[in-house]
C-alpha cells in the first residue's frame, strides 16, 4: 500500500484491518517505527477508530491473553527488536496463533523491516524477528505500507520481502 505523505494511509490501514476482521481474521499486528510518540499516536487512533477490537500496546500481554480472541485483537508495536522478540515469545507460548492466520501491517515498511545486512551475508535482527513472528501462525499476510517504496521495490524475490503487488492512492 503506497501513498503520499498525509494522504490517508492510516485510515486505509484501519479500513483493511476492519474488513479482514469481517472475513475471520482475529490477530493483527500493526508495526510502527521505533518512535515512542508515533507508536502512542497510532495506538490512540486505533483505540478510537477500531472500538470493537481489543487494542493492545507493547506492554499489554495480560489484556491480549484475557481477551482470548473473543474480539479481534490489534497489537500496535514499535519496530524494536526487544519488543518484537517479546511478542514472538508471547505468540509462541499461547495457542492463539497456532490455528489462526496472522495479519501484519507494517507502517513505514521501508524503515527497519528489510534485511539491512544482506550485503554482509547476514540477517538484521528486526528482519530475523519479523520472519520468526510470521512463522508463529499457520499462515500470515504481510501488508507493507509506505510513502517511499524504493527500498521495497529493489528487494530480490528470494528475500521474501519484495511486494507481490502495489496499490497506490494519492
Give the ranges of each region predicted by the language model.
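Hydrophobic anchor at the beta1->P-loop junction of P-loop NTPases
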Residues: 1
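P-loop (Walker A) phosphate-binding loop of NTP-binding proteins
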Residues: 4-5, 33
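Catalytic P-loop NTPase motifs of RecA-like helicase/translocase cores
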Residues: 8, 112-115, 152
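Motif I (Walker A/P-loop) of helicase-class P-loop NTPases
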Residues: 10-18
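Conserved Walker A/P-loop ATP-binding site and its immediately adjacent core
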Residues: 12, 25-50
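Short, surface-exposed basic-aromatic patches at helix termini and helix-loop junctions that form
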Residues: 18-23, 45-51, 90-98, 131-137, ...
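Conserved RecA-like ASCE ATPase "motif II neighborhood" in helicase/translocase motors
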Residues: 57-108, 112-133
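Conserved P-loop NTPase catalytic core
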Residues: 70, 100-101, 106, 118-170
Amino acid at each position: 500500500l503506497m501513498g503520499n505523505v498525509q494522504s490517508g494511509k492510516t485510515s486505509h490501514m484501519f479500513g483493511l484491518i476492519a474488513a479482514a476482521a469481517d472475513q475471520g481474521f482475529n490477530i493483527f499486528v500493526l508495526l510502527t517505527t521505533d518512535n515512542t510518540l508515533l507508536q502512542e499516536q497510532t495506538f490512540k487512533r486505533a483505540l478510537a477508530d477500531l472500538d470493537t477490537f481489543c487494542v493492545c500496546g507493547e506492554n499489554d500481554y495480560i489484556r491480549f491473553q484475557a481477551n482470548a480472541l473473543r474480539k479481534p485483537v490489534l497489537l500496535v508495536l514499535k519496530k524494536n527488536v526487544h519488543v518484537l522478540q517479546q511478542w514472538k515469545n508471547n505468540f509462541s507460548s499461547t495457542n492463539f496463533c497456532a490455528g489462526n492466520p496472522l495479519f501484519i501491517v507494517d507502517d513505514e515498511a521501508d524503515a527497519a523491516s528489510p534485511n539491512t545486512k544482506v550485503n554482509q551475508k547476514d540477517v538484521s535482527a528486526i528482519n530475523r524477528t519479523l520472519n520468526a513472528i510470521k512463522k508463529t501462525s499457520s499462515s500470515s499476510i504481510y501488508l507493507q505500507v509506505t510513502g517511499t517504496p524504493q527500498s521495497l521495490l529493489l528487494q530480490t524475490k528470494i528475500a521474501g520481502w519484495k511486494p507481490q503487488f502495489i496499490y497506490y492512492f494519492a
